Amino acid sequence: MDDPAYEDIIDEAILYFRPNVFFRNFEIKGPADRTLIYLFLYITECLKRILQQKIVQKLQASKELTTLALDSRRGFPIPGEQAFPFPSLFKPPANAQEDETMRAYLQQLRQEMGVRLIERVFPNSDGMPSKWWLCFAKRRFMDKQLTHTI
């Protein structure tokens, strides 16, 4: 959106990630909170990727996070799959069409999160990542992770 006053779920996840990453519990008041949980876990995956790959340039980070979001070999699990970290919080897809729709939606969330997160992690013109943001790469929200390998 062009309106700086407009805040969507991605902006909200970035804003509330740091204070919430320290908690093992998260009160779910509605469907948006479930999406926030997924995005918090994905932010952690992004930060781990930047830290582990020793990425020090914004362009390189952009390429890495785009690859991470789109990489089908990573097989980001969706609700209903055994590896999904919160099986009881999300309703699994009822059929193949819902499965495909959910995969596409979550992939779009991951792509947009990567784009916006890079702007926060690489805030300065020197191109170096914010150590303050990267320190959260080692934290695990609710003691869970979205994937098992990075």
Named regions from a protein language model:
Residues M1-I150:
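Surface/interface-facing alpha-helical segments and adjacent flexible terminal/loop regions used
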